A protein has these predicted regions:
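Short amphipathic alpha-helical segments, especially helix-boundary/capping motifs
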Residues: 6-8, 21-24, 38-41, 62-67, ...
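Conserved amphipathic alpha-helical segments that form helical-bundle/coiled-coil interaction surfaces
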Residues: 73, 78, 88-90, 99-173, ...
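Low-complexity, flexible helical/coil segments
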Residues: 94-96, 104, 115-118, 126-128, ...
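Alpha-helix initiation/capping motif
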Residues: 2-6, 26, 78, 125-128, ...
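C-terminal all-alpha effector/ligand-binding and dimerization domain
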Residues: 169-249
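A short, mixed-charge helix-start or loop-turn motif at secondary-structure junctions
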Residues: 30, 71, 121-125, 176-183
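Short linear motifs at protein or domain termini
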Residues: 1-95, 151, 226-237, 241-249
Length: 249
């Protein structure tokens, strides 16, 4: 029963982290989670340790557990590892893919084409941007499956989950504050890069597939780091204003 309850607690907390219910830095209180999930505290503690091993949670003595909060250096390192693994996986996919694999890779791409075209002629809505983000992940995971390397696939999936958590504040901020033209341009760029990756894999050109994936993740890293730097500056500015208000009072 302990193992079952640990799995239940693990799945519950993991899903809430991935949905963004528990954002980066959110305190994960063992007693409150146990009551929320309907299990004892022991399986919750075990679940949090598993999530720490996954890279989604950090546990500090006397401070307890929190959803992992990534700084720019950690985010860069994670993207660099993604680049190395996913570029290699794309090359393997070009070599090992089947007709069925190509259909699985193209399916999310078709959805992204449709939504991107819709966004050109309508107001940008968060629901559509979220759908694109989900199809983006589906596209990448289909490529990983086509590589036929199970170990690489598991590690890339883990990195995608970490990336999703690390990107939560960046993505929300982008949706809320970026001009419509910038959002559309970003979607167009991502779609173009995905088209290039798919075309290379479909053609069986491993070298081109690796280059296309490398370029895609390098662009993602550059844009994301720029947004993270902007957010850090905004947080510092807000902190200075708060300190000034306290001092003035």
């Amino acid at each position: 029963m302990k193992s079952v309850n640990t799995d239940i607690a693990y799945d519950h907390v993991r899903q809430r982290i991935l949905r963004g219910d528990y954002g980066p830095g959110h305190a994960l209180m063992t007693e409150a989670l146990a009551e929320e999930i309907g299990v004892s505290r022991t399986p919750v503690r075990d679940a949090l340790r598993k999530l720490e091993a996954d890279g989604l949670v950090e546990i500090q003595p006397r401070l307890g557990a929190r959803v992992k909060q990534f700084d720019r250096q950690e985010f860069r390192e994670m993207c660099e590892l993604r680049l190395a693994l996913e570029a290699q996986a794309a090359g393997l996919a070009a070599k090992n893919r089947t007709v069925e694999d190509l259909e699985e890779i193209e399916a999310p791409l078709i959805v992204m084409r449709t939504i991107t075209a819709e966004l050109e002629n309508s107001r940008v809505r968060a629901a559509k941007l979220n759908k694109i983000a989900k199809e983006d992940v589906r596209f990448h995971l289909a490529i990983m499956a086509s590589s036929k390397n199970a170990l690489m696939q598991r590690e890339i999936l883990r990195l995608h989950l970490i990336h999703r958590v690390a990107q939560t504040p960046v993505g929300k901020s982008f949706q809320e504050s970026a001009p419509r033209e910038e959002q559309i341009a970003n979607n167009d760029r991502v779609l173009t890069e995905h088209e290039a990756i798919f075309a290379a894999i479909a053609a069986g050109d491993g070298r081109a597939a690796k280059r296309a994936m490398e370029s895609h993740i390098e662009n993602l890293l550059e844009i994301s780091l720029r947004k993270l730097a902007l957010q850090e500056r905004e947080r510092v500015a807000e902190s200075l204003v708060a300190d000034e208000l306290i001092y003035s009072a």
